Amino acid sequence: MQIVKTQIELGVEKPFAFLQTTDIHLVFTDENDTEARREFARARGRDFPHAEENAAFIRQYVAKTGYPIVHTGDLMDFITPANLRFCREFVRETGMMVVAGNHEQAHCVNNVFCPEDYAGDMKRRDETLDAVQAYFDNDIRFTCREIGGVNFVGIDNGNYQISQDQFEKLKTVVAEGKPILLFMHIPLYSKELQARHYDCYLAPPEVVLATYTPWQVYEQKADERTLEACAYIRSQELIKYVICGHLHLDHETQDPTEIRQIVTGLDTLREITVV
């Protein structure tokens, strides 16, 4: 696992550091799973061969540094009892703040990732996250934690939407007047990210949606509330950075006209110093 060091300037009284990681994609199963389920996990594990090793590295690095840590979604690849048990122990041991990703809703009932199963997972997402929530200490759909005078806000956007409840809670935090680091799984659309040939953003504009397949439009088209929330996020001076994952690449916004985003990729532990 590589460590990428980033410095951000917020004008805090006392500089501090924290860690961010994302998209570990754990694939644990046990004797309670069917052989077909275990074979599916082995196949998925070939796509994420360092998942368990990365979790161990993070444990050691948090213990060594004492830095707070945020995970921005897809801690597990799909839901199994073994994955949930591991996540509970891992999060409690590291004190990790967790934001849900799109895989925290993934049942994969037919032991495959396909549009039909994914659509079913989306429809029962609230029920699923209610059950998954029991294994995490913070609210994985909306959470706020103050560190060093900065509000760390986590919003679950794993369904490519922001709910009215999340939006209202965000506005309440903004009203406190403190600088905000906003953690989400899926990054906001930006021309920079589009130039890297990725098509998995929050609130892509209509001109981009016009190039998508019908399935991508179904998955990613933002509703009016989400569009309003994204415009609000872009307009708020107190929201200093959006920090996220999902794309499996490392990226930091360079264009000064775009909202500042930090995207962290697979097998990366980002160490962020706030000054």
Q: What function would you assign to each model-found segment?
A:
Residues 1-84:
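N-terminal active-site segment of His-dependent metallophosphoesterases
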Residues 6-10, 80-179, 207-209, 252-274:
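Extended active-site neighborhood of metal-dependent phosphoesterases/phosphodiesterases
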Residues 11-36, 104-108, 178, 182-202:
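Short, solvent-exposed beta-strand-terminating loops
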Residues 22-53, 110-134, 214-218:
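Acidic/histidine-rich helix-loop elements
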Residues 23, 73-74, 101-102, 185, ...:
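Active-site glycine-centered loops adjacent to acidic/histidine catalytic or metal-binding residues
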Residues 44-48, 73-77, 156-161, 215-220:
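The substrate-binding groove and active-site-proximal loops of carbohydrate-active enzymes
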Residues 57-68, 151-153, 160-254:
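His/acidic metal-ligating clusters that form di-metal
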